[in-house]
Amino acid sequence: MKPINILLLRPESDDPSAVDQSLGARLSALEGPASSDLRVEEVSFRSDDPGDMERQLAFWQGKVSGVIGATNVPQSTRLGELAEQTNLLCFVANNNPLVWHGRGEVFHIGLPSIQTALAVASLLQKTRYRRIFLLHDQTEFQSRVASSMETALRNHGMEVAARSALFDGDFEPVREWQADLIYVVFSSESKALPVARAIRRHLGDVSLLFGRSLLRESFLSSLADIAGETWFVDMFHRDGAPSRDQQHFAETLSAHGIKVATANHGFGWDAMTFCARALTAGNGEPALAIDHLESGVAFEGVTGTCAFTPDNHNGRAGFGPTTLTRWSNGCLEEV
């Protein structure tokens, strides 16, 4: 069989999401379950130049059958437009349906916010926490995450309060509400860390929960001076019984100096694996690969299962892979 040629496209940026996704995709291409007969070219584009992504893709047109984008929502949306124009199978990690926009070539495998919210609420219902305060960033995405989470928690019988980011002078209402758990709904480490420290100054050792995007080595190191119970939304079984694919994934990252696998490592790994498997099934032809993907066949990955249809290019359903993980004494353990 002829080699499968895939382009890995990422912005020239130190954004942790793009860095982790591209590393996960690169390692999947080298050592993942679909790495045989796979050739990957990695290129970057200037995010401050609206035309640079198109120029990079134009250079590789006719030389690759698929493209993996380690890209944010606006970048992924543009990449999807270009993939449609150039007949490339395209995989990205975003969960926003605007990225797909009904394009046959585009598959987006991020976990939907509502699915994650329902899973987290179900898991928290099994704990001692019943009064949960949501502190969220003011971005559109995090406000939407907080709204989904608030609804899910209420539907699971818990008391919930929510508001956007607090500063030192704003903590009295939170103290009076007497939360069992504060869920810090932020993606940015530089924003989340000051909020966590302010909570500790004003509210003592109330339990904290952070989103899965903050479960990174750099953020864990920054938490060293923050005492108290600290949990994370997660998607891996850190100290339990991982699947064979998850174990191989974690061992591969560890061999390359990554001690804590992130969700974005996983999304990059699975995007590359799924794209390669589909193109292999389609003998390198994007149209045949899309037919295979849309047939509903289950793609098992380290981030869970995807089963795509013509009407669903996200492929996620049910409870999903969501777990809760405790950070305690320098170790991660599943709750």
Predicted regions and their residues:
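Extracytosolic ligand-binding ectodomains
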Residues: 1-335
